[in-house]
Structure formats: C-alpha cells, structure tokens
C-alpha cells in the first residue's frame, strides 16, 4: 500500500516532490517500528517489557528493512540525513535534491514518533521513570562525555555509510538480486550489536532530532525534559561520520573494484 502511494506521488507531483513524499513514508515507518520496539521493551505493562537489547537491535534492523523496501524504488530510501549527505558527497544525488531528502526525513521522523505516542498511549502514565519515556523517542549516552559520545556516533555512522556505498557499488552482484536492502538492514543490526552500547547508536540525525522534538511538544504524562543539552551529539556526529565515509570510500575504493 505504501509503495503504491509513493508511486502515485512520483507520477502526480513529479520526481522531486516524489522524493519528499517517499522519504516521509519510509522514515515514518522506520521510526514507528524502531522507536516502537524501544517503547515495547521499556514501557510499563508492555507485553515485551524488559525483553532486552537484542530485541531492540533486531527491531531496528527490521524497521530499516521495512522502510527501505517500501520506498526504495522511488527515492532510494535514504531515511537518514547522514546517508543523504554521504551520497551527495559521493555524487549520487545533486545538492538541489539533497534538501528534499532532508525535509522528507525530518517530517517522516516526527510523524513516526507521533504514531508511537498514540500506539503506547495507555502506557506512558504507568511508566514512572521520565528517562525511559525519553528513550522511547531519542538516544542518550550510557556515560555522558560529549567528546567521546560524538566520536562514537562518528564511528557508527562511518560504518553505516561506508557499508551502504560498498553494498550498493555497481560491481556488487547483490544489486541485481534485490538483496541490497536486506544487507543494509543486517548492517544496521550489526552496528547496533557492536557499537550501540555507548550512545544507543542514533547514526541518523532525523531519527533522534525529529522524535526529540515530538517528545518536547506531546502531552506525555510525567515526561520530564527532552535533554536538549545532548541533542547536538546525535546530529553532528552522524553528519561528520557520513561525510568522512563518503570521502574515504571515494579516495580508497572509488568507482571500480580493487
């Protein structure tokens, strides 16, 4: 259904608006399922309460897969400003297209977060810890040290964007078989398992900032603050990591296999 809607947007409103619409849908699905699994694990009286980190990382991997498969044919399913920045540097998209991706990603992330709020509406009041409520929307560090937290996000996003460029490279056999999206989802799963412990692996500015804004404005009972003092970390770190990954990929690997 969502893929059909994305196709309609492309046909009726021309390719660039189709990109915006597709990224709204894809990123909305990403956040609905990704933040949704976090809410399922953390919120009181959820049937999945306390099911743990493995469930969260698996859920985020599936969220990437669903969002990307839904709109991939219409926009490429960036779903992430750091990916968009990396692909812009790599030359896959133009600067005039990039801002349309950014816009769609932010709107989609906010819509997805709102749907998570609605889905778990009855559980917010029964959850006492405001930190758990915030964690259902945005990331936070296990140990707060801004320098190291930024570095962690740079490393995680570097792996993500470098991996995407490698997986999607023209010489890869998986491009013809339709496995690219599945491999990217597994890449995100691997990043979460291996590198997600220190900061919760935002690796996506829209994934963190959009839901954090929604946390701030939604009437969530006993929600506490939105931790704006940390909010720049999961924005700046992923953007740096995505840019460095594209620069490194082009310098070391380029457009042809080794």
PLM feature segments, named:
Residues 1-258:
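Membrane-interface helix-loop junctions and terminal tails of multi-pass membrane proteins
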């Amino acid at each position: 259904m969502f893929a059909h809607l994305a196709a309609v947007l492309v046909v009726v409103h021309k390719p660039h608006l189709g990109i915006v619409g597709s990224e709204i849908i894809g990123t909305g699905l990403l956040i609905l399922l990704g933040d949704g699994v976090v809410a399922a694990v953390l919120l009181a009286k959820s049937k999945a309460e306390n099911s743990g980190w493995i469930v969260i990382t698996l859920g985020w991997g599936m969220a990437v897969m669903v969002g990307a498969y839904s709109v991939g044919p219409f926009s490429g399913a960036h779903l992430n400003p750091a990916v968009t920045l990396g692909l812009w540097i790599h030359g896959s998209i133009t600067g005039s297209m990039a801002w349309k991706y950014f816009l769609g990603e932010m709107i989609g992330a906010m819509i997805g977060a709102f749907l998570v709020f609605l889905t778990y509406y009855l559980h917010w009041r029964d959850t006492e810890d405001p930190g758990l409520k915030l964690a259902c929307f945005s990331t936070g560090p296990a140990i707060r040290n801004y320098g190291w937290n930024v570095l962690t996000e740079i490393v995680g996003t570097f792996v993500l964007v470098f991996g995407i460029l490698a997986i999607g490279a023209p010489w890869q056999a998986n491009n013809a078989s339709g496995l690219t999206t599945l491999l990217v989802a597994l890449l995100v799963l691997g990043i979460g398992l291996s590198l997600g412990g220190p900061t919760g692996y935002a690796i996506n500015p829209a994934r963190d900032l959009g839901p954090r804004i929604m946390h701030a404005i939604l009437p969530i009972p006993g929600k506490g603050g939105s931790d704006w003092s940390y909010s720049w970390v999961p924005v700046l770190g992923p953007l740096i990591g995505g840019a460095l990954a594209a620069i490194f990929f082009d310098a070391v690997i380029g457009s042809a296999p080794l």
